[in-house]
Design a protein with these regions (language model features):
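N-terminal accessory regions of nucleic-acid-interacting proteins
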Residues: 1-84
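Residues at alpha-helix termini
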Residues: 23, 39, 58, 136-137, ...
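Acidic, divalent-metal-coordinating active-site segment for phosphoryl/phosphodiester hydrolysis
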Residues: 231-244
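Conserved non-catalytic scaffold segment of RNase H-like nuclease domains
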Residues: 72-76, 82-184, 190-193, 208-226, ...
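Short, glycine/acidic-enriched loop or turn micro-motifs at the edges of active sites
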Residues: 93-95, 201, 238
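Active-site catalytic microenvironments for nucleophilic, acid-base chemistry
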Residues: 36, 182-186, 205, 221, ...
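Conserved beta-strand -> loop -> alpha-helix junction used to position metal-binding or nucleic-acid-contacting
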Residues: 191-203
Length: 246
């Protein structure tokens, strides 16, 4: 059973099914999927449907219509920019690499129609100690997160907030990697299926003449205040305003 609508499976069977469907144009008979992916030769159609339904129930990218398995990737072009939601987010963590490091704070802002429409913020108990240099950088201490929810308690609320929005972050590779690592700890073999954008990459393409593309530099370029740098809520708000200006 799919744990949340905007999660996609990382299981070998499902990824093999998706690779097969991509290679044949997006759809294939259930019996062929079972034959190719599960190595069950000449399965009975009813048996093939049953096996395929198990895959479909675990991943929103797959569907079954009239014994044909279809790849149903979301069409982001079907919605105009005014209708599309963008969740601009930032994480603070116990270090630079996951694993072993963990998330200690999440800040996020929903941008719709060129304006901030909603916000999300939570400290997160990492279930491990916060290194002194991270406390010095962020101001977040072990005492501050001791009574905070663990990621497993924050995740359902954050996933609900994100919905089917496009995720945006400054250095998205880092933040998406950490976020998916934490999600994989809670929902084994799953990751976020949302499309993502990186404001570092966007600013490099749109602002080639700025000194560098660090958050503070781009914030200064657009006169966006960044008072409490290296806190997730403040960095996410500044990134959201930068994204709106870009």
């Amino acid at each position: 059973m799919l744990p949340h609508p905007n999660l996609v499976s990382e299981s070998l069977l499902i990824n093999s099914t998706i690779d097969l469907l991509i290679s044949v144009g997006g759809s294939a008979p259930a019996v062929e999927v079972v034959d190719y992916v599960m190595r069950i030769r000449d399965p009975h159609p009813d048996f093939a449907r049953m096996l395929v339904m198990d895959l479909i129930n675990r991943d929103p990218r797959l569907s079954l219509v009239d014994d044909l398995v279809h790849l149903t990737e979301p069409d982001h072009n079907a919605r105009g920019l005014e209708e599309m939601g963008f969740v601009v987010f930032d994480l603070e963590t116990t270090g630079a690499k996951a694993p072993p490091c963990r998330v200690i704070e999440i800040g996020a802002y929903l941008v719709r129609g060129g304006a901030i429409a909603a916000e999300f913020h939570s400290l997160v108990n990492p279930e491990t100690s916060i290194p002194p240099f991270i406390t010095a950088l962020t101001g977040i201490s072990d005492e501050m997160v001791a009574a905070s929810p663990v990621f497993g308690e924050v995740a359902p609320r954050f996933l609900e907030f994100v919905g089917d929005s496009v995720l945006v972050a400054h250095n998205a590779h880092f933040d998406m990697g950490f976020l998916n690592h934490e999600i994989g700890r809670i929902y084994e073999d799953y990751r976020l299926g949302n499309a993502s954008l990186c404001t570092v990459q966007l600013s490099r393409g749109l602002l080639p003449d700025v000194e560098n593309h660090k958050l503070k530099t781009i914030a200064n370029h657009f006169s966006v205040p960044l008072i409490n740098h290296h806190r997730a809520d403040e960095d996410a708000r500044a990134t959201a305003e930068i994204f709106i200006n870009l």
